[in-house]
Amino acid sequence: VNNVIIRRATLDDVHAITQMHADYSAYANTLQLPYPTEKTWEARLGANDPLVTQFVATLDNVVVGLLVVHQPAQIRRRHVASFGITVSQAFQGKGIGSELMQVMVDYCDNWLNVHRIELEVFAANGSGLGLYEKFGFKQEGILRDYAFRDGQYVDAIVMSRIKSKS
Protein backbone atom coordinates (compact mmCIF):
# COMPACT_ATOMS: atom_id res chain seq x y z
CA VAL A 1 0.00 0.00 0.00
CA ASN A 2 1.44 3.36 -0.98
CA ASN A 3 1.30 6.43 1.24
CA VAL A 4 1.64 4.49 4.49
CA ILE A 5 3.31 6.62 7.14
CA ILE A 6 4.86 4.97 10.18
CA ARG A 7 5.42 7.17 13.22
CA ARG A 8 5.56 7.00 17.00
CA ALA A 9 2.21 6.37 18.63
CA THR A 10 0.77 9.19 20.74
CA LEU A 11 -2.11 9.58 23.16
CA ASP A 12 -4.09 11.02 20.24
CA ASP A 13 -4.08 7.48 18.77
CA VAL A 14 -5.84 5.86 21.75
CA HIS A 15 -9.32 5.80 20.20
CA ALA A 16 -8.10 4.44 16.85
CA ILE A 17 -5.95 1.74 18.48
CA THR A 18 -8.84 0.71 20.74
CA GLN A 19 -11.17 0.49 17.74
CA MET A 20 -8.62 -1.57 15.80
CA HIS A 21 -8.33 -4.05 18.69
CA ALA A 22 -12.11 -4.32 19.05
CA ASP A 23 -12.10 -6.53 15.94
CA TYR A 24 -11.63 -10.26 16.56
CA SER A 25 -8.95 -10.57 13.87
CA ALA A 26 -6.82 -7.94 15.62
CA TYR A 27 -6.59 -9.63 19.00
CA ALA A 28 -7.13 -13.30 18.12
CA ASN A 29 -3.44 -13.83 17.36
CA THR A 30 -2.22 -11.86 20.36
CA LEU A 31 -2.23 -12.46 24.11
CA GLN A 32 -4.59 -9.50 24.55
CA LEU A 33 -8.04 -10.06 25.98
CA PRO A 34 -10.95 -9.05 23.75
CA TYR A 35 -12.77 -5.74 24.08
CA PRO A 36 -9.99 -3.53 25.43
CA THR A 37 -10.98 -0.18 26.86
CA GLU A 38 -9.61 3.19 25.88
CA LYS A 39 -8.26 3.49 29.44
CA THR A 40 -6.19 0.35 28.85
CA TRP A 41 -4.58 1.82 25.75
CA GLU A 42 -4.25 5.25 27.32
CA ALA A 43 -2.27 3.70 30.17
CA ARG A 44 -0.04 1.80 27.74
CA LEU A 45 0.64 4.80 25.53
CA GLY A 46 1.09 7.16 28.45
CA ALA A 47 3.41 4.94 30.47
CA ASN A 48 6.62 6.49 29.05
CA ASP A 49 8.46 3.21 29.67
CA PRO A 50 11.95 3.65 28.16
CA LEU A 51 12.03 -0.08 27.36
CA VAL A 52 8.84 0.03 25.26
CA THR A 53 8.49 1.86 21.94
CA GLN A 54 5.18 2.03 20.10
CA PHE A 55 4.66 2.91 16.45
CA VAL A 56 1.53 3.25 14.34
CA ALA A 57 1.07 2.81 10.61
CA THR A 58 -1.30 5.38 9.15
CA LEU A 59 -2.93 5.61 5.75
CA ASP A 60 -4.62 8.91 4.92
CA ASN A 61 -4.29 9.86 8.61
CA VAL A 62 -6.14 6.70 9.72
CA VAL A 63 -4.36 4.27 12.07
CA VAL A 64 -4.20 0.89 10.29
CA GLY A 65 -1.43 -0.84 12.23
CA LEU A 66 0.44 -0.93 15.53
CA LEU A 67 3.98 -2.08 16.36
CA VAL A 68 5.20 -2.39 19.95
CA VAL A 69 8.91 -3.10 20.60
CA HIS A 70 9.90 -4.35 24.08
CA GLN A 71 13.35 -4.61 25.63
CA PRO A 72 13.92 -6.65 28.78
CA ALA A 73 14.65 -4.88 32.06
CA GLN A 74 17.45 -7.31 32.87
CA ILE A 75 20.78 -5.66 32.04
CA ARG A 76 22.28 -8.90 30.70
CA ARG A 77 19.43 -9.21 28.17
CA ARG A 78 19.59 -5.68 26.78
CA HIS A 79 20.85 -7.12 23.49
CA VAL A 80 17.38 -8.68 23.02
CA ALA A 81 14.06 -7.25 21.89
CA SER A 82 10.62 -8.69 21.33
CA PHE A 83 7.69 -7.15 19.54
CA GLY A 84 4.02 -7.34 18.67
CA ILE A 85 2.27 -6.26 15.49
CA THR A 86 -1.41 -5.66 14.81
CA VAL A 87 -2.88 -4.68 11.43
CA SER A 88 -6.53 -3.69 10.95
CA GLN A 89 -8.50 -6.48 9.31
CA ALA A 90 -9.40 -4.35 6.27
CA PHE A 91 -5.70 -3.76 5.60
CA GLN A 92 -4.29 -7.24 6.24
CA GLY A 93 -2.46 -8.78 3.31
CA LYS A 94 -1.60 -5.40 1.80
CA GLY A 95 2.02 -5.09 2.93
CA ILE A 96 1.47 -3.03 6.08
CA GLY A 97 2.78 -5.82 8.31
CA SER A 98 5.92 -5.94 6.15
CA GLU A 99 6.38 -2.18 6.44
CA LEU A 100 6.04 -2.38 10.22
CA MET A 101 8.50 -5.29 10.30
CA GLN A 102 11.02 -3.29 8.27
CA VAL A 103 10.76 -0.39 10.73
CA MET A 104 11.14 -2.78 13.67
CA VAL A 105 14.24 -4.47 12.22
CA ASP A 106 15.84 -1.13 11.34
CA TYR A 107 15.04 0.30 14.78
CA CYS A 108 16.47 -2.74 16.58
CA ASP A 109 19.55 -3.15 14.36
CA ASN A 110 20.56 0.47 13.88
CA TRP A 111 19.30 2.34 16.93
CA LEU A 112 18.93 -0.05 19.86
CA ASN A 113 21.99 -2.21 19.13
CA VAL A 114 19.80 -5.31 19.45
CA HIS A 115 21.53 -8.57 18.53
CA ARG A 116 18.57 -10.96 19.01
CA ILE A 117 14.93 -10.26 18.19
CA GLU A 118 12.58 -12.92 19.54
CA LEU A 119 8.88 -13.66 19.38
CA GLU A 120 6.20 -16.21 20.06
CA VAL A 121 3.56 -16.79 17.39
CA PHE A 122 0.53 -19.06 17.57
CA ALA A 123 1.23 -22.23 15.58
CA ALA A 124 -1.97 -21.77 13.54
CA ASN A 125 -1.03 -18.22 12.47
CA GLY A 126 0.29 -19.11 9.02
CA SER A 127 0.41 -15.54 7.74
CA GLY A 128 2.40 -14.44 10.78
CA LEU A 129 4.85 -17.33 10.41
CA GLY A 130 5.36 -16.45 6.76
CA LEU A 131 5.92 -12.78 7.52
CA TYR A 132 8.49 -13.50 10.21
CA GLU A 133 10.34 -16.02 8.04
CA LYS A 134 10.45 -13.41 5.25
CA PHE A 135 12.44 -11.20 7.63
CA GLY A 136 14.93 -13.91 8.57
CA PHE A 137 13.32 -15.31 11.71
CA LYS A 138 14.02 -18.99 12.41
CA GLN A 139 11.90 -21.40 14.44
CA GLU A 140 13.49 -22.46 17.73
CA GLY A 141 10.82 -24.60 19.32
CA ILE A 142 7.19 -25.19 20.22
CA LEU A 143 5.49 -24.04 23.42
CA ARG A 144 2.73 -26.59 23.95
CA ASP A 145 -0.58 -25.32 25.36
CA TYR A 146 1.01 -21.87 25.50
CA ALA A 147 -2.18 -19.80 25.72
CA PHE A 148 -5.91 -20.14 26.20
CA ARG A 149 -7.93 -18.81 23.26
CA ASP A 150 -11.49 -19.39 22.13
CA GLY A 151 -12.07 -21.98 24.84
CA GLN A 152 -9.01 -24.12 24.17
CA TYR A 153 -5.28 -24.26 24.71
CA VAL A 154 -3.15 -23.47 21.68
CA ASP A 155 0.52 -23.99 20.88
CA ALA A 156 2.98 -21.25 20.00
CA ILE A 157 6.21 -21.33 18.07
CA VAL A 158 9.29 -19.53 19.39
CA MET A 159 11.23 -17.73 16.67
CA SER A 160 14.26 -15.46 16.64
CA ARG A 161 16.42 -13.42 14.32
CA ILE A 162 20.09 -13.01 15.16
CA LYS A 163 21.69 -9.92 13.65
CA SER A 164 24.27 -10.88 11.04
CA LYS A 165 27.84 -9.78 11.63
CA SER A 166 28.10 -8.00 8.26
What are these regions, as identified by a protein language model?
Residues 109-120:
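Conserved GNAT acetyl-CoA-binding A-motif
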Residues 94, 98, 110, 123-141:
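Conserved active-site alpha-helix within GNAT-family acetyltransferase domains
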Residues 122-129, 145-166:
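C-terminal "cap" of GNAT-fold acetyltransferases
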Residues 8-11, 24-90, 101-102, 107, ...:
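Acetyl-CoA-dependent GNAT
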Residues 4-19:
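A short beta-loop-alpha structural element at the N-terminal edge
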